[in-house]
Amino acid sequence: MIKTDALIIGAGPTGLFCAHQLGLIGLNCEIVDNLDKIGGQCIELYPDKPIYDIPAVPECTGEELTNNLIKQIKPFNIKFHLNERVEEVNKVNNKWIVKTNKKKEFVTPNIIIAGGVGSFEPRKFSPKECEKYENRSLFYSIKDKTIFQDKTISIFGGGDSALDWAIELSKSSYVNLIHRRDEFTGAQLSIDKIKELEKSGKLKIYTKYQLNSVKGEQNIKSIEIKHDDESLKELETNYVLGFFGLIMKLGPIVDWGLNLDKKTIPVNTENFETNLNGIFAIGDICTYPGKLKLILSGFHEGALAARGCFKYARPDEKLRFEFTTTSKAAQERLGVKK
């Protein structure tokens, strides 16, 4: 049985920064995530994709952001339990008893849900034969863009992910961009850019087409795409990428007694507590009036949720607000040497 001041469910940027905020105020925590690596969607979906809206960081990748957050929480010696999912949550004597699918048991006054409670699954191609090529020459997310260098890539989708990767991969590969509709739904700047790239011969756009079949032995050699008018076209290609969005499955969380709004958890905006005392929700999983699904917003939510945990972890103490620039206690916890 593992005792901790707070258990964070989700090892993405929001959960990592919340762990930092807990450490600053003297609370310990452990982190559980059903993914096999730290970083959440940042690492799983766009480790190499640039992020432009982190304060004071003009540009960084999901991997760089994750690595910096890990470095930031290093002084607190936080233990991670990866590739593990929370299955049961029960309250006994003002403590939450949390059990995972690997039979671990945590006792804590606080649970912070920062994602990691369910799973994100990509919407997939319809043709059944696509399954045999998955993670070899057909992908729904990109973890290492270098494998596509000097290859022909066929990208399916019309949203931001498809457009962004078409632009990025066209720098070192030839790209076919295929969309089932006549118009793209991504940012206008990206739409303008792909049209420029087509004019320069860097990529080819096919609209009103969908994947009809895939050909190849171990790896894909060519694909057949079908137009709305039923005409067929065959394209030679080395890799196929599909960006049709994600389906989120909440998993066991639906049985925990939380109020749910579709696939999100309503919270207050004072400390992002749910309808259950001692359970907080931050990041994309939570909802409230004016909610923005930004990493920046998740950092704010994590900071306030951490302070909300203090009253349950230290009921006989009063939390004083202090700046890290002047707080000796915070600096000692961070290992600052003077």
From Swiss-Prot:
Top-rank EC class of the record's enzyme: oxidoreductase
Entry note: cofactor: Binds 1 FAD per subunit.
Coiled-coil region: none
Cofactor(s) named in the record: FAD
EC number: 1.18.1.2
Top-level taxon: Bacteria
Catalytic activity: 2 reduced [2Fe-2S]-[ferredoxin] + NADP(+) + H(+) = 2 oxidized [2Fe-2S]-[ferredoxin] + NADPH
Name this protein carries in UniProt: Ferredoxin--NADP reductase
Alphabetized GO MF terms: ferredoxin-NADP+ reductase activity; flavin adenine dinucleotide binding; NADP binding
Binding site for FAD: T14, D33, Q41, Y46, V86, F120, D284, T325
Alphabetic keyword roster: FAD, Flavoprotein, NADP, Oxidoreductase
Pfam family, one: Pyr_redox_3
Manganese recorded as keyword: no
Complexes and interactors: Homodimer.
Family: Belongs to the ferredoxin--NADP reductase type 2 family.
Origin species: Pelagibacter ubique (strain HTCC1062)
Source lineage: Bacteria, Pseudomonadati, Pseudomonadota, Alphaproteobacteria, Candidatus Pelagibacterales
PANTHER family: THIOREDOXIN REDUCTASE 1-RELATED-RELATED
